């Protein structure tokens, strides 16, 4: 690893954004910066105002200090050189620290554009074969064209690779590009559903266009509600609101429809709740229980058996045994034969 120092350019400009310097071992040296490429190691060619950069604008003096270098900046310009936004007196030499900001050219008034040449000073240790901009200083008085900022190859025996294979972009630029690529990452949305009764696997998020087409979960089934719907005609309160008003206003319509496998009990849903539960008034069982009160019960064998209660004695009869229909029992009062005989006498 070679102890080097760098000038990293900040802002606009074409190429030459990173300059890496490695002075010869064991001796100090001087690097010159300015717009005279034939006299300077680093050519500063302004694009906006050429007169703001002197031919030899400033010098970098490097002196060995242990395993590192002591670097100082000296101003030789008429327009000025700034270190951390403080103007350096002409001819004065100032030692630089890692991270200092160097500005070559005058500091513009507030509201104007800053200087084109704005650098950060860095002290680093690098491998020579990783940079094509490691240079040696130009000897004073040398005016050969193209002999300014040129690469220095590694020492004999050190691993090296051809300069043509090196990346043309500066290393600092590559690092900034890799950091900027973090903005391209797209976080995956965390989707979960509430757990009822145990853990569940997370559902796979569907594309936005398919969300509206996803089938909704079926509503939970209520077993008690289902049974009530099967025996909807057994309860006066279960009549729908669309039923005819006479049926809703009649308090003494006592009809029930039983299924053959079901056995009526004292708390049977079809029995009107306005009558007390007692043994004589309990509806007879279907299939094997107490028959209806008709003198000649025919014991209907249908799966669904309809019952009707007498409005006089509150006794239950099979609709088929008394010879009437459910519709007729709903529309008018039902009287059993015994009650009708009592009314006639």
UniProtKB/Swiss-Prot annotation:
Compartments, as annotated in UniProt: Nucleus
InterPro entries, alphabetized: FHA_dom (IPR000253), SMAD_FHA_dom_sf (IPR008984), TCF19 (IPR042803), TCF19_PHD (IPR039095), Zinc_finger_PHD-type_CS (IPR019786), Znf_FYVE_PHD (IPR011011), Znf_PHD (IPR001965), Znf_PHD-finger (IPR019787)
Protein keywords: Metal-binding, Nucleus, Transcription, Transcription regulation, Zinc, Zinc-finger
Start and end residues of each FHA domain: 31-88
Binding site for Zn(2+) 1: 296, 298, 318, 321
Region annotation Disordered: where it falls in the sequence: 138-167, 190-277
Ranges annotated as PHD-type zinc finger: 293-342
Entry-linked PROSITE patterns: FHA_DOMAIN, ZF_PHD_1
Predominant location category: nucleus
Pfam families given in the database record: FHA (PF00498), PHD (PF00628)
GO cellular component, one term: nucleus
GO BP terms in the entry: regulation of gene expression
PANTHER family listed in its UniProt record: TRANSCRIPTION FACTOR 19
Protein's UniProt name: Transcription factor 19
């Amino acid at each position: 690893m070679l102890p080097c120092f760098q000038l990293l350019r900040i802002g606009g400009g074409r190429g030459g954004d990173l300059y890496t310097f490695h002075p010869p071992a064991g001796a100090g040296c001087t690097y010159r910066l300015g717009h005279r490429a034939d006299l300077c190691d680093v050519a500063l060619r302004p694009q906006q105002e050429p007169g703001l950069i002197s031919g030899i604008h400033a010098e970098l003096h490097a002196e060995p200090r242990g395993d590192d270098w002591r670097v100082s900046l000296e101003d030789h310009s008429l327009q000025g050189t700034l270190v951390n936004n403080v103007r350096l007196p002409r001819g004065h030499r100032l030692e630089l620290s890692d991270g200092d900001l160097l500005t070559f050219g005058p500091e513009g008034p507030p509201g104007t554009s800053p200087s084109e040449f704005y650098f950060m000073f860095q002290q680093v240790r690098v491998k020579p074969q990783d940079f094509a901009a490691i240079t040696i200083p130009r000897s004073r008085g040398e005016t050969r064209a193209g002999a300014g900022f040129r690469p220095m190859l590694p020492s004999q025996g050190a691993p090296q690779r051809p300069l043509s294979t090196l990346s043309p972009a500066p290393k600092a630029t590559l690092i900034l590009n890799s950091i900027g690529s973090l903005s391209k990452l797209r976080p995956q949305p965390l989707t979960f559903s509430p757990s009822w009764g145990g853990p569940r696997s997370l559902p796979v998020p569907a594309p936005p266009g398919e969300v509206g087409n996803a089938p909704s979960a079926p509503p939970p089934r209520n077993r008690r509600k289902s049974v009530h719907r099967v025996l909807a005609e057994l309860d006066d309160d279960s009549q729908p609101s669309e039923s005819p008003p006479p049926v809703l206003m009649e308090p003494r319509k006592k009809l029930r429809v039983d299924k053959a496998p079901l056995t009526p009990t004292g708390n049977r849903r079809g029995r009107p709740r306005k009558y007390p539960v007692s043994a004589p008034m309990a509806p007879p069982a279907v299939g094997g229980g107490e028959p209806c009160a008709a003198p000649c019960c025919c014991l209907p064998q249908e799966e669904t058996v309809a019952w009707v209660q007498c409005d006089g004695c509150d006794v239950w009869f099979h609709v088929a045994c008394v010879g009437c229909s459910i519709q007729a029992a709903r529309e008018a009062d039902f009287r059993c034969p015994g009650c009708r005989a009592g009314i006639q006498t």
